[in-house]
Amino acid sequence: MAAATFVEKFRGTEFVHASVYGSWWFVGLWAVLALLAVAYFVGRRVRRASVVLLHLSFAVILAGALLTHVTSWQGAVRLRVGETVSTYYENVPGGDVVERKLPFELRLESFDVKYHDGTRAEADYVSRFTITDGGATQRAEVSMNNVWKYRSVRFYQSSYDPDMRGSILALNSDPWGIPVTYAGYALLFLSLVWLLVDPKGAFRRLFKSDMMRRGVLSVMAVCAMSQAAGAANTLPRETADRLGRLNILYNDRVCPLQTFAVDFTKKLCGSARYGDYTPEQVLAGFIFYGDEWSAEPIIRVKNGPLRDALQLPGRCSVNTFFNQVMGGYILGPYLNEYYHGHNDKFHKQVADIDDRLMMVMELRRGTLLRVFPFTSGGKTTWYSPTENITDTLVDEAHRKYMQNVFSLIYGEVLAGSYGNVDKILDKMLKYQQLNGGSSLPSAAQVKAERIYNAIPFATILFMVNLTLGVVLLIIGLIRLIRPVKTDKPDRPDKALLRAVPVVGGALLGLSLLALTACIALRWIVGGRVPMANGYETMLLLAWFVMVLALVAARRFRIALPFGFLMSGFFLLVSHINQMDPQITHIMPVLSSPLLSVHVSVIMMSFALLSLTFICGLTAIILRLVRGRNAVELDGQLDSLALLSRLLLYPALALLGVGIFVGAIWANVSWGAYWSWDAKEVWGLITLMVYAVAAHAASVPFLRRSMGYHIFMTLAFLTLVMTYFGVNYFLGGMHSYA
């Protein structure tokens, strides 16, 4: 399966589905695996009900998948308003599409795209149609995450025509596979819960071990670059702050202008501040003092072939790229090559710089400043000061205000009358409040977003957590390697070591509170659970790691450095440039409570599995440092293995539940509970690999603590591939890099 995901990358989805996932030999492999499991159960005489039920659930799921493979069909029907259709197009093996007859007729009555108020961001797609079967007619309606079922056929909203007069519905008929598969999911959930609470199960037996009773796991105590900005003119800080309090339509979302200023500054210079200037002052500088700021070396140019070829400094101005001696826009010829297929690193850097320069040009033209709302008939539209307003509903007074107010501000700025500028900006805010309708964010959302913009939570927390994690881990390792002698109870270093876990726990708690505030602010601002993109899932994963570390630290002090390190790592990943922290409306298909459950459960599982990785890594380091014959080493390795296994069982349960909740969501959203997407495949691989560790009784290598730790350390690579490899290399439906 792993190889198939790489083949798909280079040969395409249709090829790998026809040659691997849909082939007879692949189905046969699953059948052989199921038969071997049955033979093993019979041979070992496994009778514990929870274990039997768990493996039975997998057999039922495989049976459901087989029924779906053999008996189901999928297709699509294209509808136009007022036209009757009685055929659909079915996908057949080999990638062909065949037109087939429907057992009833369909007629599209209407199709609507619903938008978030005041924006062009789609909130939902709704198709209303009638089904005529013989002499009976019934009305039906489908939208994203709202399926209509008639007889054995399920209808899903798939796409629509550009003229808004047509809709494409996906069809799926799977009367046998879905109920059997869902029954398997239900059995899986029950069996996983049963395994965790079964007094005779492996998980509960871990709590009865001698090491738990003796507390052996307590052997460990705990385990923006400054810029030389010039003195370019801009608005005073207080006036610029007033500018930032205005609302703007940005990224298909109405938000404080401060948010746009922060993103504008980040994109230009790589950080939220430029020298002593606030983001609002940087934005105001380019708006009102464009010539001065075009000469300011604010644009960050990374090391690479572009800097080498053009002999550019690390910080350039806008004017640097416009040189009459060199023919005007010096990036022009290279940009033309980029759009003709030259996608090497040099030309990608050219495109990146051009993107930032065009942003500055559009700002100076005023097209980015959509700060003037007008509401008519319950619909709100936001305009920029230079926009050609063709809407006849906008009266002349509003039109003149929109077109002239920035010129008025510019005149006051040139005169240095910043008090008058403040008054104009206050009136603009009142204008927005009077004309913005329901598109305006609430006062709570505005306050939350301004706080969120002012505090770089992820940046601060990743540095703090990684630093504290390294310090605490070093202290713990030193104590393991050079234990404190107990014959001198009054030694000051012993008292210090006793205080370390208390202080570490308090600091981790403070870090958790700060991250909770960060997530809560994003939740308030976005009006949705913040788990829809890579940045947000990294925050959530770090949050779960810290919660688990604090809970586990009451018994296992080693959990503290583990919690700091892993949460710091996840926050570092969220901080890097590859992830975009902007808050936006999510796609309609993602507006489902099942998605929230799916992501949160998976993230909890990943958090637990990441801690098992740290356990394994620590064990390997101890073995390398202390050697094979060190006194007490075996006991320490056993203690780490016990902690790792205590984390493993709930992690597997959560991963299994998360995967199959995701399958149910997929079936509700687009009619296929399993599509062999790269993320699905690697999620299944991760589950199967970690499940091997739960079968230590059948694998001699895993019975030894060191062997177990080596396996768990290597198993973490599957998790890394599931999250990062798919997002940044393989791609697919689940890629949100």
Regions found by a protein language model. Give the residues of each.
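Solvent-exposed, non-transmembrane regions of integral membrane proteins
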Residues: M1-A737
